[in-house]
């Protein structure tokens, strides 16, 4: 090849690169638009679920609301991030727990817990608060279903996380630490471990007084 041919090929290569960049940019825009649409649709499923629960004339309102939540979760699972999936699972778990469907709530919380543990291993400060919140809710769930050993395990794990976080930002995390210790105090009281119950209550009261 002579110099002229090389220059022509180089110009063509540059042109192809620029065309490729345009396609990539266009593709990114389409992907981002699709993700935003998916987020909106997932949120619409949640809003539908909440609206269904206010329709007291509908005998199947709970079943229909669950279906709407599950549709939103599967849409999120297929298209969005693990972080967004974890949030959807947590919200559905709270809904089920509030409606005393503890078996179903446990399944969703446990899946959320697995995701939060993976994310927290990579970025503790970003995801440990969500992990502790799920553990606290599971502690409440297990306490309500008389699974006291599992409840204590979850509460203690949450307390450990909140203690670390409160050292960094007490204003934000001291209330969570106090509430979880109070929940642990309730658990020890219900299982007649009164000395440990008193210890947890007193530590919670001390934190609340300082808020």
Could you describe each region identified by the protein language model?
Residues 1-41, 55-58:
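Long, domain-scale regions corresponding to catalytic signaling modules most often appended to membrane systems
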Residues 7-10, 20, 58, 62, ...:
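TPR-repeat structural position
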Residues 21-27, 31-34, 38, 52, ...:
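Alpha-helical junction/boundary sensor with strong preference for TPR arrays
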Residues 36-43, 63, 80-83, 122, ...:
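Residue signature of alpha-solenoid helical repeat architecture, marking inter-repeat boundaries
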Residues 46-54, 83-98, 129-144, 175-190:
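Conserved alpha-helical positions within TPR/SEL1-like repeat arrays
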Residues 118, 124-125, 129-132, 164, ...:
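Conserved positions within tandem-repeat grammars
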């Amino acid at each position: 090849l002579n110099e002229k041919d090389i220059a022509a090929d180089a110009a063509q290569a540059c042109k192809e690169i620029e065309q490729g960049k345009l396609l990539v940019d266009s593709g990114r825009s389409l992907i981002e638009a699709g993700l935003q649409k998916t987020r909106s649709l997932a949120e619409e499923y949640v809003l539908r679920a909440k609206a269904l629960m206010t329709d007291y004339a509908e005998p199947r309102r709970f079943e229909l609301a669950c279906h709407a939540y599950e549709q939103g979760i599967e849409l999120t699972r297929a298209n969005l991030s693990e972080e967004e999936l974890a949030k959807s699972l947590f919200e559905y778990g709270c809904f089920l727990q509030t409606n005393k469907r503890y078996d179903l709530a446990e399944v969703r919380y446990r899946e959320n817990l697995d995701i939060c543990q993976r994310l927290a291993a990579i970025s503790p400060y970003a995801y440990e608060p969500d992990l502790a919140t799920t553990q606290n809710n599971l502690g409440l769930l297990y306490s309500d279903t008389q699974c006291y050993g599992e409840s204590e395990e979850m509460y203690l794990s949450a307390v450990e996380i909140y203690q670390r976080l409160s050292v960094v930002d007490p204003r934000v995390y001291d209330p969570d630490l106090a509430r979880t210790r109070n929940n642990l105090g309730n658990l020890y009281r219900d299982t007649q471990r009164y000395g440990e119950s008193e210890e947890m209550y007193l530590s919670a009261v001390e934190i609340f007084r300082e808020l």
